[in-house]
């Protein structure tokens, strides 16, 4: 741990098209090599695809997807007397959001469609229907926490 003071949280500006801060965080995570305009193009084109498929507001779909992906508990390693236990702990709201965003992006990148916008749109549609790799990741995390419930008294 650093002995200095904690870094200040910077305010994320809302995106230009939808005026949403969470969407900006998503784009920032999607961005590679500082190419924000490329990330924006991918997201907006994916949103257009989602809107044409589901006939719903893409921003609503996006937030519903994140809600379906957000984990409520996770396991953390805790060393007690030479043994390492996987201790289930509740996830803070900021971390929930960050994990959901990260899992959605990783699941999208792992898909087999041709372009990133197709992959992202496909994963968004799957996540809103509670399918897909990102939702599976959350289910696996919850299963791990449930399996290690016996060690929950080691919480810190």
Curated annotation (Swiss-Prot):
One annotated GO molecular function: structural constituent of ribosome
The record's keywords, sorted A to Z, are: Ribonucleoprotein, Ribosomal protein, RNA-binding, rRNA-binding, tRNA-binding
List the PROSITE patterns.
RIBOSOMAL_S7
Query: SUPFAM superfamilies annotated for this entry?
Result: Ribosomal protein S7 (SSF47973)
**What is an annotated GO biological process for this record, any one?**
translation
Q: Does the keyword Transport apply?
A: no
Q: Which Pfam families match?
A: Ribosomal_S7 (PF00177)
Supply the InterPro entries for this chain: Ribosomal_uS7, Ribosomal_uS7_bac/org-type, Ribosomal_uS7_CS, Ribosomal_uS7_dom, Ribosomal_uS7_dom_sf
Task: Work out whether the entry's keyword set contains RNA-binding.
Answer: yes
- GO cellular component terms given for this protein: small ribosomal subunit
Chain's role? One of the primary rRNA binding proteins, it binds directly to 16S rRNA where it nucleates assembly of the head domain of the 30S subunit. Is located at the subunit interface close to the decoding center, probably blocks exit of the E-site tRNA.
Q: How does it assemble?
A: Part of the 30S ribosomal subunit. Contacts proteins S9 and S11.
| UniProt cross-references to HAMAP family, sorted A to Z | Ribosomal_uS7_B
Name the NCBIfam families on file: rpsG_bact (TIGR01029)
Q: Family per UniProt?
A: Belongs to the universal ribosomal protein uS7 family.
Quote the protein name from its UniProt record: Small ribosomal subunit protein uS7
């Amino acid at each position: 741990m650093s002995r200095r003071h904690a870094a200040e949280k910077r305010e994320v500006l809302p995106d230009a098209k939808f005026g949403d801060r969470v969407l900006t965080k998503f784009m920032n995570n999607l961005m590679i090599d500082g190419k924000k305009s490329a990330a924006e193009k991918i997201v907006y084109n994916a949103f257009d695809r989602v809107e044409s498929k589901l006939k719903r507001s893409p921003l609503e779909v996006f937030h519903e997807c994140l809600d379906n992906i957000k984990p409520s508990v996770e396991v953390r390693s805790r060393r007690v007397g030479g043994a390492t236990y996987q201790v289930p702990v509740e996830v803070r709201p900021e971390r929930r959001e960050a994990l959901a965003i990260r899992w959605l992006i990783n699941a999208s990148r792992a898909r087999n469609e041709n372009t990133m916008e197709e992959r992202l749109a496909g994963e968004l549609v799957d996540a809103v229907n509670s399918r897909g790799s990102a939702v599976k990741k959350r289910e696996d995390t919850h299963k791990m926490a449930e399996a290690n419930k016996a060690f929950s008294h080691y919480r810190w």
